[in-house]
UniProtKB/Swiss-Prot annotation:
This is Elongation factor Tu. Residues 136-139 are annotated as: G4. It comes from Clostridium tetani (strain Massachusetts / E88). GTP binds at residues 19-26, 81-85, 136-139. The lineage of its organism: Bacteria, Bacillati, Bacillota, Clostridia, Eubacteriales. The keyword S-adenosyl-L-methionine does not apply. GO terms for molecular function: GTP binding; GTPase activity; translation elongation factor activity.
Length: 397
């Protein structure tokens, strides 16, 4: 049979299953692929195929993740499922598996558990804005009032972490029953209802090319008689010759310039877009007025900041991280996009020290300003080796 071509006719959305261990995340993932597979929208994956997730290395951190894909009438989905709790923490903080939205799986028999809370908190910190709830194992609960109680608890928990808990769709069912009886419409209805809720409630993400232009500067050189060229990979947006941009970061003032030429693979371009590796010729900018670690950005779209709160995962010794804990006032380098900037950290009240393998909210004060938005990822480095990975959850100055 000839291989099918990947059709990009439907909008693409990245989602994932989150929730407490043994509440049925992997069973649900298997059920979704199996039931959509029966309708011709997916390749069915068995529980074991999803559960034995391959280990991946992302920024030196070992993460086990399973990726499956499937379609509904309206969309194409890439879906991630992690076997272990630590894998979720690492995945969400490093952004290894991007999620535009999530399916929170809660066992109706047990109600919200510690990791339920932790995953909701993490989702709010790393910018996952839309959560659809699946109350699983409903076949184990005889009393409808108990299910209503669990639903109320989950909605309250979501409200507590800034999600619209009262508006979030909640679907009740049994992933196992659906998986075991894919032909039985009554058993599979909960999966169809869940996917309908995901289709409707999780918005199609804005494409990278629709966002304001931004390119981290990797290198700078001078072309005699033409001016200064900054090279790098366009992170988002589109850049056209004649566009006005700002050079942001590593100083308090941003400098404006106009793009007088764009080159890619030694060919001249009229416009560059997200993903392109380019050289941009800048009008009126001297070689010493721009440096690696700054960004070129659409005017007014990004500001330089020096203090922020970050959600951080600290690498374990086995991952090449520190062998010892660190304390308040620790001063490592923070690696943003293309450069290291020294900063000092303040730990939350009541936290004396941070051990390798922990994840923690910390306040960071950098010695110089860096172009940043909430949701920007960074690495924490010490003498050139990565000891932590983080995401900016709130900018304070």
């Amino acid at each position: 049979m000839a291989k099918e071509k990947f059709e990009r006719s439907k909008p693409h959305v990245n989602i994932g299953t989150i929730g407490h261990v043994d509440h049925g995340k992997t069973t649900l993932t298997a059920a979704i692929t199996t039931i959509l597979g029966h309708k011709g929208f997916a390749k069915a994956f068995k529980y074991d195929e999803i559960d034995k997730a391959p280990e991946e290395k992302e920024r030196g951190i070992t993460i086990s993740t399973s990726h499956v894909e499937y379609e509904t009438e309206n969309r194409h989905y890439a879906h991630v499922d992690c076997p272990g709790h630590a894998d979720y923490v690492k995945n969400m903080i490093t952004g290894a598996a991007q999620m535009d939205g999530a399916i929170l799986v809660v066992s109706a028999a047990d109600g919200p558990m510690p990791q339920t809370r932790e995953h909701i908190l993490l989702a709010s910190r790393v910018g996952v804005e839309h959560i659809v709830v699946f109350l699983n194992k409903a076949d184990q609960v005889d009393d409808a009032e108990l299910i209503e109680l669990v639903e109320m608890e989950v909605r309250e928990l979501m409200n507590e972490y800034g999600f619209p808990g009262d508006d979030a769709p909640v679907v009740v069912g049994s992933a196992l029953k659906a998986l075991e009886n894919p032909e039985d419409d009554a058993a599979t209805q909960c999966i169809m209802d869940l996917m309908a809720a995901v289709d409707e409630y999780i918005p199609t993400p804005e494409r990278a090319t629709d966002k304001p232009f931004l390119m981290p500067v990797e290198d700078i050189f001078t072309i005699t008689g033409r001016g200064t060229v900054a090279t790098g990979r366009v992170e988002r947006g589109i850049l056209k010759v004649g566009d006005e941009i700002e050079i942001v970061g590593l100083s308090d003032e941003s400098k404006k310039s106009v793009i007088t030429g764009i080159e890619m693979f030694r060919k001249l371009l009229d416009e560059a877009q997200a993903g392109d590796n380019i050289g941009a010729l800048l009008r009126g900018v001297q070689r010493d007025e721009i440096q690696r670690g700054q960004v070129l950005a659409a005017t007014g779209s990004v500001k330089p900041h020096k203090s922020f709160t970050g959600q951080v995962y600290v690498l374990k010794k086995e991952e090449g991280g520190r062998h010892t804990p660190f304390f308040n006032g620790y001063r490592p380098q923070f690696y943003f996009r293309t450069t290291d900037v020294t900063g000092s950290i303040a730990l939350p009240e009541g936290v004396e020290m941070v051990m390798p393998g922990d994840h923690i909210d910390m306040k960071v004060e950098l010695i110089t300003r860096v172009a940043m938005d909430e949701g920007l990822r960074f690495a924490i480095r010490e003498g050139g080796r990565t000891v932590g990975s983080g995401v900016v959850s709130e900018i304070t100055e």
